[in-house]
UniProtKB/Swiss-Prot annotation:
Species lineage: Bacteria, Pseudomonadati, Thermodesulfobacteriota, Desulfobacteria, Desulfobacterales
Organism: Desulforapulum autotrophicum (strain ATCC 43914 / DSM 3382 / VKM B-1955 / HRM2) (Desulfobacterium autotrophicum)
Comment, domains: Consists of two distinct domains, a catalytic core and a N-terminal extension that is involved in tRNA binding.
Chief location category: cytoplasm
One Pfam family hit: tRNA-synt_2b
Keywords: Aminoacyl-tRNA synthetase, ATP-binding, Cytoplasm, Ligase, Nucleotide-binding, Protein biosynthesis
Full protein name: Serine--tRNA ligase
Pathway: Aminoacyl-tRNA biosynthesis; selenocysteinyl-tRNA(Sec) biosynthesis; L-seryl-tRNA(Sec) from L-serine and tRNA(Sec): step 1/1
Description of how the protein assembles with itself and partners: Homodimer. The tRNA molecule binds across the dimer.
Catalytic activity, as annotated: tRNA(Ser) + L-serine + ATP = L-seryl-tRNA(Ser) + AMP + diphosphate + H(+); tRNA(Sec) + L-serine + ATP = L-seryl-tRNA(Sec) + AMP + diphosphate + H(+)
CDD domains cross-referenced by the UniProt entry: SerRS_core
Length: 427
């Protein structure tokens, strides 16, 4: 959430920033509510002053044993008027709060302007895509031919956009999870967490999925609980409504969790394979930082995610998202896109974002500098380190062999009992 004082004083700048995101908001309604709120506050203040004056007059009359009935009636009338105005004020405050919760973060000044992913800026390419001298297959065909992925039976068990891993497929997924967690905890200094996979409404409000994106979530019927769309949500809410000490920052968390997304609006997109699933595994990275170090920490977060791909030997590129492609809570985002030869394109495998104080303001996460009484909002950052299913897909496509087998990246072999190649396991 943006600071309301900033929005009040810079309304045109906020309008322009929202326009760069191709977003819409009821700024006229906000202005009316703000005007009405100021009028109500003035009226309430005047009535309270009147009530206090009458109260003092009643006390004086009682001391002098005078009849205070008329004054008492006047005070009750004034009190009733105050209650009515307080109710109207609460309605205006609620409208303003809902307006503020629906406004996305402001793009960083360095973010390129644009309307869609076609306007994103390429930062770098790492690794050279492999040349194949045999027909390339997509990962869904490779996995099914090897007997390690079974999409038809997953659909039978649940429905579309679910996957069933078998044998070495399941081991490869688990190996990647363990490798990523070991890398981020042992080398990158993150603290491993195992958070709940179900969160309450307040948690999703804090990170920005609610109220605007409820249709993208899986809600538990009859409860104010939701399945997590990413472990960014529980990890960012660990310190909700708390005050941290500057000396403990940055705080760096990582977690493996399944993630659940309804993929509303994705009909017809990536209907095959592991790219767009209702349930998928992800290793997530979250940081709490001071404002002055958050962009340095963003570069570090990006490097941490890149290291996974470098160790696996997968070619990738990094792009900066344009204003129209930014996520709701982010002010700047890097996407890492891995090369998928079976699809002849780069596909997103990680998003690394700085949300500055946007989430911290919504979740009320503050810190205190040494020797200072004033509290400040932390900056929060998050990034995938990495999306596990998409990494499996990239391994299958990049390391496929002419005989249909797949070479296991060397760094994963200790996690797979020394196995070097996945061969046909069809049952």
């Amino acid at each position: 959430m943006l600071e309301i004082k900033y929005v009040r004083e810079n309304i045109e700048e906020v309008k322009q920033a929202l326009a760069k995101r191709a977003g819409k908001a009821d700024f006229e309604g906000f202005a009316r509510a703000e005007k009405k709120r100021r009028e109500l506050l003035q009226q309430i203040e005047e009535l309270r002053h009147q009530r206090n004056t009458v109260s003092d007059e009643i006390a004086r009359m009682k001391r002098n044993k005078e009849d205070a009935g008329t004054s008492i009636l006047e005070m009750r009338t004034v009190s009733d008027e105050i209650k009515t105005l307080d109710k109207t004020l609460a309605e205006q405050d609620d409208f303003i709060q809902q307006f503020m919760m629906a406004i996305p973060n402001m793009p960083h000044p360095d973010v390129p302007m644009g309307a869609s992913d076609a306007d994103n800026t390429l930062e770098k390419k790492v690794g050279t895509p492999r040349s194949f001298d045999f027909p390339i297959k997509a990962h869904w065909d490779i996995g099914e031919d090897l007997g390690i992925l079974d999409f038809p039976r997953a659909a039978k068990i649940t429905g579309a956009r679910f996957s069933l891993y078998l044998g070495s497929g399941a081991k490869l997924e688990r190996a990647l999870i363990n490798f990523m967690l070991d890398l981020h905890t042992n080398e990158h200094g993150y603290t491993e967490t195992l958070p709940p996979f179900i969160v309450n409404r307040e948690s999703l409000l804090g990170t920005g999925q609610l109220p605007k994106f409820e249709e993208d979530l899986f809600k538990i019927e009859g409860q104010e609980y939701y399945l997590i769309p990413t472990s960014e949500v529980p990890m960012t809410n660990i310190y909700r409504d708390e005050v941290l000490n500057e000396e403990n920052l940055p705080i760096k968390f990582t977690a493996y969790t399944p993630c659940f997304r309804s993929e509303a609006g994705s009909y017809g997109k990536d209907t095959r394979g592991l790219i767009r699933q209702h349930q998928f595994n992800k290793v997530e990275l979250v940081k709490y930082t001071t404002p002055e170090t958050s962009y340095q920490e963003l570069e570090s977060l990006l490097a941490n995610a890149e290291t996974v791909l470098k160790r696996l030997g997968l070619p990738y590129q990094v792009v900066t998202l344009c204003s129209g492609d930014l996520g709701f809570s982010a002010t700047r985002t890097y996407d890492i896109e891995v090369w998928m030869p079976g699809q002849d394109k780069y596909r997103e495998i990680s998003s690394c974002s700085n949300c500055e104080a946007f989430q911290a303001r919504r979740a009320n996460i503050k810190f205190r500098r040494a020797g200072q009484k004033k509290l400040e909002f932390v900056h929060t950052l998050n990034g995938s380190g990495l999306a596990v299913g998409r990494t499996v897909a990239a391994i299958l496509e990049n390391f496929q062999q002419p005989d249909g087998s797949v070479v296991i990246p060397e760094v994963l072999r200790p996690y797979m009992g020394g196995k070097e190649t996945i061969t046909n396991e069809t049952r």
